[in-house]
Amino acid sequence: MTTTVETFVPEAPPKPKKAIKGEKLRGYDKVARIPIKVIPTVEAPKKPDWIRVKMSSPAEVDRIKKTLRKQKLYTVCEEAACPNLPQCFGDGTATFMIMGDICTRRCPFCDVAHGRPNELDKDEPRHTAETIQGLGLKYAVITSVDRDDLKDGGAQHFVDVINESKALSPNCLIEILVPDFRGRMDVALDLLTETAPDVFNHNIETVPRLYKAFRPGSDYQHSLDLLKQYKARRPDIATKCGFMVGLGETEEEVYALLDDLKAHDVDMITIGQYLQPSKNHAPVDRYVHPDEFQRYMDYGKKIGFFSIWAGPMVRSSYFADRQYYGEDCPAPIRSKKALEAEGKLGC
């Protein structure tokens, strides 16, 4: 009798969906075509006690969401699944995301959808300005998806939002968190030099060694140059940059990154813990202890940044107004039991 042994053939991964104009691609469909593949996480590491968010007023959260939907606006808080949303919305603050909710990049750490975006909404600058006025904001953060399909990368749209917002709320400070304007830096800088925000922010996201894996389509030196060139054109405007830890970088690489940012004339820094949005996103390499974040802040102050905020829940626009005015970074929320275990509570 002959026994037939079947050869195991691994199941081929599903073919990712094609990008159709106006259709959002998330999860596997978003990251399947990046150079370094993301292996879906089977079991995520347990979050430590310092990954905590302070809850605020549910009524205020609901009020802001209703206002945003009425004006057909997006926030990065919602689209990127920011864990601080309840606290920020509860405190009456939000980061507006302009130029739609579909990004032309596929960064595996980000939860914003990828695809072929729709045309710009010509009414969005006015709607954003009306919302800022309606919420009575004194400090507004405006960010965007990447729009590699636009000749100016969306710089003119930023200008339109700034102009409309300043017209209705002249006392409101405007911070813009811009993409890298890849291939369009000069035209973007020309526009944003002429019509300047109060803070020019661009996130470098991670250390250079990890760029290919986590920022496909972006360039570390290009981001540094964008920050330095803007400061050279508008030395009166504060520049700001943020990045994540917990992706696989070393502590020494973080210090080197801070040195690079200081050498490129950045004024303010934010450093936060990377949190995996879903199993199809890049995995968390480690949860960085609050003591390590404190070392980064100590080093940043030592080398002369105007302000450096670093902590597990810090994000680029986290209490941006407080950082602008020079306040200290809020301490992470810790459990009494954990602090006792680390010997950080007195008798």
Swiss-Prot record:
SMART domains: Elp3. GO terms for cellular component: cytoplasm. GO terms for molecular function: 4 iron, 4 sulfur cluster binding; lipoate synthase activity; metal ion binding. It is an enzyme of class 2 (transferase). Its cofactor is [4Fe-4S] cluster. PANTHER family: LIPOYL SYNTHASE (PTHR10949), LIPOYL SYNTHASE, MITOCHONDRIAL (PTHR10949:SF0). NCBIfam families: lipA, PRK05481.1, PRK12928.1. This is Lipoyl synthase. It comes from Psychrobacter sp. (strain PRwf-1). The lineage of its organism: Bacteria, Pseudomonadati, Pseudomonadota, Gammaproteobacteria, Moraxellales.
